[in-house]
Amino acid sequence: MKDVGFGITVQDKNAPDLVPLYKISNEMGMEFATASLHNSFYFVEAKNIIHDRSMVAKNFENLVNELLRSNSPKKWFRAYFNHGLINYIYGQKRLLPCDMSFDTFFIDPYGDVMPCNGTKDKEVMGNLNTQSWDELWNSPQAEVVRKKV
């Protein structure tokens, strides 16, 4: 199999598992992806909160240090991304801007095209049942959504 890896959405309960899980994935030669706990209209959740931010941030910092010890530029980039998640946990901007809606997108089962399914509110760029792809992608509504992401 190719392109198999581990992914973890980090919260208070699993933050201490970050480095051990990374080490397991590394030993198995697999990718390791992270995300911070967040709220999303798609998953009908608005109460996701990281309560112990300093503990979660410390575990992200430990992961960043592990990634920087490697000889892989890809892992160094992931360290930078994870360092940015520390900012995000504290309510600051991420270091890397979100590029969703510019080169990637999410289509729901009803044809609504959105930047992703992880936004707090449903941000629809258009609908493939009523618009052509070019019309939707280049529409004023798509530009409005891109400015929000």
Question: Which positions does each model-derived feature cover?
Answer:
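Residues that scaffold the ATP/ADP-binding catalytic core of kinase and kinase-like folds
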Residues: 116, 136
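Short, local alpha-helical segments
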Residues: 118-121, 143-145
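Cysteine/selenocysteine-centered motifs that mediate thiol-based redox chemistry or coordinate metal-sulfur cofactors
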Residues: 138-149
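Radical SAM enzyme [4Fe-4S]-AdoMet core and its adjacent flexible, acidic
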Residues: 1-114, 120-128
